[in-house]
Amino acid sequence: MSDSLAGNGMRQNLNRSSTSSNHTGHAQNGRAPQDPLVDAGHFIKQLACQVQSLACLKWLSELQILACIPLEGSRPLHDVAELANVPASQLSRVVRIVATIGFLNEPDPGHIAHTALSAQFVVDFSLFDSILFLLTTVVPCSMQMSTLTQRHGSAFPTNDGAYRIAFNTSQSFDAACVEGSRLRREWLAYKSNTTIVDETIADVLLRQDWHSLGHVKVVDACAQSTDFGNSLAERCSTLRVVVQLDTATTNGHSEIDSSMSRGRAVIQRRPQGTRQMVEDAAVCILKIEAPSTTIRARVTAELLAHLEVLRNNESAVLIVAAPLLPEPGTVSTSAEASARSSDLTTLQLSNSPQLELDRLIDIVENVPNARDSLKVVQRILFRNGMVAAIEVRYRASSEDQFATPAGTIDW
């Protein structure tokens, strides 16, 4: 009897173990299931699924299969395969894997229908341009990152890059975009669809409380156009706005084009890095719209160019707006991952990494001939919490960073 009870108990334990294993799908050999976040096998499987999903999206795009599926209702799989001239068996496999990520579905066996996600790709061609750019340009370049490092070691290459290695060319990515309309179109679509902020630096600056400043002069230094300056002047009539266009912006012409002169802002020409001529400015704005290999030199030159204005008027502010990476923990994990992915992409394509905030602060506070004089006193944020710009003032070295002393612009 005892043997029978022991056997029944053993069978019950085995049944419980089997049931537990079936429910979790992970418990094997008596081991507890692992957290997916630390399960290396799960991590690799997820990567494999993402790779195949990307490949399937490219397949669907290049064979124009989505256009064969009605936006409303469904269509038999064999009809879609016949219309697109693809094997029905392969189409079925592709549909079933992308269905796991919410792209297409199979409402009834043997029928294909759009989801809310896949339908967007039918009406917005820039979405597939983004996918194609990711697969045909970003992926090949990213795979050459190690080759580039092995070739140059710790030195930062200025005339070489992952793009040139991936496509075996001496042409830079920027030059290739100028020559190739398709590459340029795909790149612009990719940038638009991977941005993690839904507003521009100009949007952030325009929503500040400029009315609180009263009748002061604001300079948009090294501007690429008059758009921001005119918008600011129209929004706040008490400001006297000066837009300083770089020589390159006006193509070296001595006269400002009439289309640039429209609006309330006063237009001037000032080459980058030359002394700021508006000595009574309360606010000077330096907007760096895109990452650049020369960003340190450019910011340093502009800080020196504005040093006299800031020194002579300690309540004056220089706003430095540049593409900055989010500080760890300040935004959601997905937003930070997207921002850092974008940073690596621009680095691999054109050797133009984005700046970390502490790096920009280091540039500001270690300007030659101005050390311990220029301080970052304020941060201007995007709505998602990322830093859009910093405010720089001429201050005594004993004053606290990020404090707002009397007389300072406080948005």
UniProtKB/Swiss-Prot annotation:
Keywords in alphabetical order: DNA-binding, Nucleus, Transcription, Transcription regulation
HTH iclR-type domain ranges (all copies): 47-117
DNA-binding region: 77-96
Domain of life: Eukaryota
Predominant cellular place of this UniProt entry's protein: nucleus
Region of interest (Disordered), residue spans: 1-32
Keyword Nucleus listed: yes
An MF annotation (GO) of this entry: DNA binding
GO CC term, one of those recorded: nucleus
InterPro entries: SAM-dependent_MTases_sf, WH-like_DNA-bd_sf, WH_DNA-bd_sf
Protein task: Transcriptional coactivator; part of the gene cluster that mediates the biosynthesis of cladofulvin, a conidial pigment not required for virulence but that plays a role in fitness and resistance to environmental stresses including UV light and low-temperature stress. With claE, coregulates the production of cladofulvin.
Name under which the protein is recorded: Cladofulvin cluster transcriptional coactivator claA
Native organism: Passalora fulva
